[in-house]
A protein has these predicted regions:
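Short, glycine/charge-rich flexible loops or terminal/linker lids adjacent to PRPP-binding catalytic cores
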Residues: 326-368
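PRPP-dependent phosphoribosyltransferase catalytic core
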Residues: 253, 257, 382-427
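Metabolite-binding pocket within alpha/beta catalytic cores that recognizes anionic/polar moieties
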Residues: 1-127
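Zn-dependent metallopeptidase/amidohydrolase metal-coordination segment
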Residues: 185-220
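Short glycine-rich phosphate-binding loop at a beta-alpha junction
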Residues: 303-310
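His/Asp/Glu-rich mid-to-C-terminal helical/loop segments that flank catalytic regions of hydrolases
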Residues: 209-249
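Active-site-facing substrate-recognition patch
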Residues: 252-303
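Active-site rim beta-loop-alpha module in soluble metabolic enzymes
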Residues: 130-175
Length: 427
């Protein structure tokens, strides 16, 4: 996989990246900032030094179009950008990370789009959600696991530079944003136009100049704080790259799992496409991948009980329960459990059905994972959730191997967290 890193990360100065070399790409927009390529496990990492190795390129003079074009042409799918920011909020202290979810463009003199005309078609790119939610999730998870103080949402306001704000500007900016910098726009705009998964690690270095009890920001303050934070930034990037890599492996595994599920047309009646998991169950590699994905998702969630829905849900739930050292509990159709039960009736297209659980299956406040092989209309799953709640169990998540999105079953479970492995859309 190819991953781009923009800004000062420290990785390019370490021996973590193997086979480092300088890269230069010809672009329609002129010369890009210096790029260094290196290998990290199976990944190719491209580190773009936005301001140059000696910080010789001013914010306004950064050739953002050439930079993003070069990373796209090099084949990067993901881009992690680091940036120093001035905090506009008391709670965002120097040394904190902000994983921004929005930005405001306050620049005036920069080329902000690849689409200077519409000769090849109209393009109005949506920037409603300017940053990759997938990458933001990885960054937030990584900060949490590394125990780094961070803020999960916030708005960056980008100014022109290279000067810092006046005090009046700083007070005004506080009405709009959480932090201020000189780098994020138009970099984020261009990354969105280039269809890159792009996210920003904003490192608070100062309080700009609005806070009278603090010294107004200077380059010296910014540089010193960046140097103090450099090791943390490096660890955060490496942890996030590991998550990106793992997710890419999972994506390939899910495609393999899906390929092992057989579709039988017109079963059990005309017009039904039956998703048959018996072909997956008999495939050791496919089942191993299913259990590994679920195990890695729930291994740190303190699951007490795994409830499986009759009947194919039993298979996955029982195997996973053993691996997680959790109890396995069956949820069955009416009349199939031998001891005292409680029941829940739900509507079918024509008539009703009932599911039951043993009255002593779950203790109050136990953390319960509910599993079935497939979610279609969601009636059975919702009834099963209600059974668990009648016993005062806490539903951690409802997990399915297969989702049939056109039947909208997940919508019935809107009060619960739902996880699915593969979707079948009229295939």
């Amino acid at each position: 996989m190819k991953i781009g890193i923009i800004g000062g990360s420290g990785l390019e100065k370490s021996d973590i990246l193997l086979n480092q070399e300088e890269i230069e790409i010809e672009t329609p927009y002129g010369k890009h900032s210096p790029i260094k390529k290196g290998n990290l496990n199976e990944n190719e990492i491209f580190i773009l030094s936005r301001h140059g190795y000696n910080h010789e390129i001013t914010p306004t003079k950064i050739n953002n179009r050439a930079n993003i074009y070069a990373l796209k042409k090099l084949g990067c799918e993901f881009v992690l950008a680091t940036t120093a920011v001035g905090s506009l909020r008391n709670q965002i202290e120097p040394g904190d990370f902000l994983i921004a979810n929005q930005f405001i463009d306050f620049t005036k003199h920069r080329n902000i789009t690849f689409y200077e005309d519409f000769k090849e078609g109209i393009n109005h790119t949506s920037l409603a959600e300017p940053f990759s939610e997938k990458l933001r999730d990885y960054l937030i998870e990584s900060c949490t696991e590394l125990n780094f103080k961070h803020h999960k949402i916030g708005t960056i306001l980008t100014i022109e530079g290279p000067r810092f704000s006046t005090r009046a500007e700083s007070f005004m900016f506080r009405n709009f944003a959480h932090v201020v910098n000189m780098s994020t726009s138009p970099e984020a705009i261009l990354a969105k136009e280039a269809e890159l998964e792009y996210a920003v690690i904003a490192m608070s270095t100062d309080y700009d100049c609005w806070k009278k009890t603090e010294e107004p920001v200077t380059w010296k303050i910014v540089k010193e704080q960046m140097e103090q934070n450099s090791e943390k930034v490096k660890k955060l990037l490496l942890k996030t790259i590991e998550k990106i890599t793992n997710q890419n492996t999972i994506k390939a595994d899910l495609e393999f799992i899906k390929s092992k599920i057989r579709t039988i047309p017109n079963f059990p009646k005309q017009g039904i496409q039956f998703r048959d998991i018996t072909t997956l169950l008999k495939d050791p590699e496919g089942m191993k991948k299913v259990i590994e994905i679920l195990y890695n998702r729930y291994k740190d969630k303190n699951i007490d009980v795994i409830a499986g829905i009759e009947s194919r849900g039993f298979i996955i739930a029982a195997i996973l329960a053993e691996k997680l050292n959790a109890s396995f509990v069956p949820i069955r159709k009416k009349g199939k459990l031998p001891a005292e039960t409680i029941s829940e009736t739900y509507d079918l297209e024509y008539g009703t059905d009932t599911v039951e659980i043993h009255k002593d299956a779950i203790l109050p406040n136990q953390n319960v994972l509910l599993i079935d092989d497939l979610i279609a209309t969601g009636g059975t799953a919702l009834a099963s959730c209600k059974l668990i709640e009648k016993l005062q169990g806490k539903i951690h998540e409802v997990s399915f191997l297969i989702n049939l999105p056109e039947l909208k079953g997940i919508q019935k479970l809107s009060n619960y967290k739902v996880f699915t492995l593969v979707d079948f859309n009229n295939e």
